[in-house]
């Protein structure tokens, strides 16, 4: 990385043509393998292992790939030649993984270097706790209790391939790399192996995680850059024609003349987006837009966003993907929690000159974060820890492991879910979840030793697997003051605790996300309108490009 920084600092002109030659360097593919291995395990070599490749022969394959890339010219390539010769790796999934992984590494260099150089100049130390998923919940607890409405937005996808390339072109000026990206995407689209209606994009995301997230983050950063600008300058937006605002070409040039246009031509229109208290949170494939304004203001934002995606990204965004809820009357889904603002009466005693009176008209708002038991049971059932009714079941696939390994796996799962849902206002769901995992572990061990669960507990005693229930108390006793634990474990389970070391969502929580959406009833209405809509963001990202290109 130090070598890259020196290269960039020498001459800024070479930044435009610096990326493409890196694609022919062997160490780029080694970096791609390391990053993919750390991101999702040994995903980079999954297809290679299926085809009979191993790590020893990977270096030979990389050299063979580079040699073929030297022989094939991506910049001048007719459609007839592409059908005759084909793109490098179109018959070899391992080659396609290497190309996409290497390309993802080199295109991230222009984004990472400025931040590193700027950080070195300013010497600003940033807390790593901000990466935690739980770091957003204290903000929601403090802010959302003062807000009135929230819009639950399902971020639209996919966009056309050419528009996606144009978005990346606004950030990367390396023309050969853009030609390679365009050729790579369109060739995969033509072979029906990269974008098809039969094969979901989730497979591509698993095999090429770094490249997949680069494409998605480029799209998200594009719309958020425009959206955040409009939010910051909302006091100047006086119901102007949005079609003049959201065109990508000369966008910032038009903004300079925006106040003049607004004052001269739009006196009769109402102010659209004047709201000093607006909060935006994005997570996975969804976003939340909360406001202290009125229902009319939220509806204006909804239709603006619908037209924004239609005009700026050239595809239809269904209005029912944005659902407006009043915080005091309905709940919204967020990172595996049901969140709702409850209005609680607060009695206040007033005393003056010996006389006292009780005033019970004071109302307080509090954001409650709840963990519904039905989606949790559904996720545990999908993982074969119980049935759909919540009755614990054994894990036959784990009976070949040792007793300590079986117990360690169950304890690890229980610890992960307990920590993730420790911010729940009511902990009854956690008690039941631990009960299911405890009995599932006992049934698995009993099945391994060919005995009954009752006989197993009688032999080991009632204290068997007690760590399922006592581990969190032991941990909190080391962190929290002794005074906070003086009243026992009941006091601990009534408090909401947010862990700032959780940087990824658990698979069981991910499984329960769809079930949680079905439980609310809001998503159920959307299913009745259009049953073929895709709920999970990672399954269908670039689907529209099949019909649009």
From Swiss-Prot:
One GO cellular-component annotation of the UniProt record comes to: chloroplast
Main localization is plastid
List the Pfam families hit by this protein, alphabetically. Intron_maturas2 (PF01348), MatK_N (PF01824)
One of its GO biological process terms is: tRNA processing
Is Transmembrane one of the keywords UniProt gives this record?
no
Membrane spanning stretches? none
> Member of which family?
Belongs to the intron maturase 2 family. MatK subfamily.
Which function does this protein serve?
Usually encoded in the trnK tRNA gene intron. Probably assists in splicing its own and other chloroplast group II introns.
The record ties this protein, via PANTHER family, to: MATURASE K (PTHR34811:SF1)
State the protein's name. Maturase K
**Gene name for this UniProt entry:** matK
């Amino acid at each position: 990385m130090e070598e890259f920084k020196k290269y960039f600092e020498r001459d800024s002109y070479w930044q435009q043509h610096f990326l493409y030659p890196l694609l022919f360097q062997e160490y780029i593919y080694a970096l791609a393998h390391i990053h993919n291995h750390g991101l999702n395990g040994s995903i980079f070599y999954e297809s290679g292992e299926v085809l009979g490749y191993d790590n020893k022969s990977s270096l030979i394959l990389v050299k063979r790939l580079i040699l073929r890339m030297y022989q094939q010219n991506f910049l001048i390539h007719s459609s007839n030649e592409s059908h005759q010769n084909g793109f490098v790796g179109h018959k070899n999934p391992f080659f396609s993984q290497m190309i996409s992984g290497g390309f993802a590494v080199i295109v991230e260099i222009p984004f990472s270097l400025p931040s590193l150089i700027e950080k070195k100049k300013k010497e600003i130390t940033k807390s790593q706790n901000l990466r935690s998923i739980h770091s957003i919940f204290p903000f929601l607890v403090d802010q959302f209790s003062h807000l009135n409405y929230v819009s639950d937005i399902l971020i639209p996808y996919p966009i056309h391939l050419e528009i996606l390339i144009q978005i990346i072109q606004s950030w990367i000026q390396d023309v050969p790399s853009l030609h390679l990206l365009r050729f790579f995407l369109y060739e995969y689209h033509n072979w029906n192996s990269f974008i098809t209606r039969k094969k979901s994009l989730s497979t591509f995301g698993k095999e090429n995680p770094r490249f997949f997230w680069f494409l998605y983050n480029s799209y998200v950063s594009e719309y958020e850059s425009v959206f955040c600008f409009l939010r910051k300058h909302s006091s100047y937006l006086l119901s102007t024609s949005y079609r003049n605002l959201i065109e990508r070409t000369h966008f910032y040039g038009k903004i300079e003349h925006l106040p003049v246009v607004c004052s001269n031509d739009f006196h009769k229109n109402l102010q659209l987006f004047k709201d000093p208290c607006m909060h935006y949170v994005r997570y996975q494939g969804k976003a939340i837009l909360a406001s202290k304004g009125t229902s009319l203001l939220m509806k204006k934002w909804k239709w603006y966003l619908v037209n924004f995606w239609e005009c700026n990204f050239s595809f239809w965004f269904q209005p029912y993907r944005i659902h407006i809820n009043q915080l005091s009357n309905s709940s919204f889904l967020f990172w595996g929690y049901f969140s709702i603002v409850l209005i609680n009466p607060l009695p206040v005693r007033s005393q003056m000159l010996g006389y006292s009176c009780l005033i019970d008209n004071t109302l307080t708002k509090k954001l409650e974060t709840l963990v519904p038991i039905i989606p949790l049971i559904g996720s545990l059932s999908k993982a074969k820890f119980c049935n759909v009714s919540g009755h614990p079941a054994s894990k036959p696939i784990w009976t070949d492991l040792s007793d300590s390994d079986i117990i360690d796996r169950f304890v690890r799962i229980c610890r992960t879910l307990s920590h993730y849902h420790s911010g729940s206002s009511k902990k009854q769901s956690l008690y039941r979840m631990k009960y299911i995992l405890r009995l599932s572990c006992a049934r698995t061990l009993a099945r391994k030793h060919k005995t009954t669960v009752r006989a197993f507990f009688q032999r080991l005693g009632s204290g068997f697997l007690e760590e399922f229930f006592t581990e969190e108390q032991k941990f909190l006793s080391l962190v929290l003051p002794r005074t906070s634990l003086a009243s026992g474990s009941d006091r601990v389970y009534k408090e909401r605790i947010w862990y700032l070391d959780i940087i990824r969502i658990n698979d069981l929580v991910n499984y329960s996300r769809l079930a949680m959406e079905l439980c609310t009833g809001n998503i159920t209405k959307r299913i009745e309108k259009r049953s073929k809509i895709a709920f999970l963001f990672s399954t269908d990202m670039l689907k529209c490009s099949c019909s649009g290109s």
